[in-house]
Amino acid sequence: XVRDAYIADDKNCVYTCASN
């Protein structure tokens, strides 16, 4: 998913991980 794509990015992971 799309979420996986964001997780790949450390910067975006902060938002994605927090949301997830």
UniProtKB/Swiss-Prot annotation:
Q: Which domain of life is it from?
A: Eukaryota
Q: Does the keyword Secreted apply?
A: yes
Cellular localisation: Secreted
Where, by residue number, is the motif Important for toxin selectivity for individual Nav channel subtype (Nav1.6/SCN8A and Nav1.7/SCN9A), but not for toxin potency? 9-11
Q: In which tissues is it expressed?
A: Expressed by the venom gland.
Record site: Important for toxin potency but not for selectivity for individual Nav channel subtype (Nav1.6/SCN8A and Nav1.7/SCN9A): 6
Q: Does the keyword Ubl conjugation apply?
A: no
Describe the function of this protein.
Alpha toxins bind voltage-independently at site-3 of sodium channels and inhibit the inactivation of the activated channels. The fraction to which this protein belongs exhibits low toxicity and induces transient paralysis in all insects tested (the crickets A.domesticus).
Family indicated by similarity? Belongs to the long (4 C-C) scorpion toxin superfamily. Sodium channel inhibitor family. Alpha subfamily.
Q: What is stated about domains?
A: Has the structural arrangement of an alpha-helix connected to antiparallel beta-sheets by disulfide bonds (CS-alpha/beta).
Q: What is this protein called?
A: Toxin Bl-3
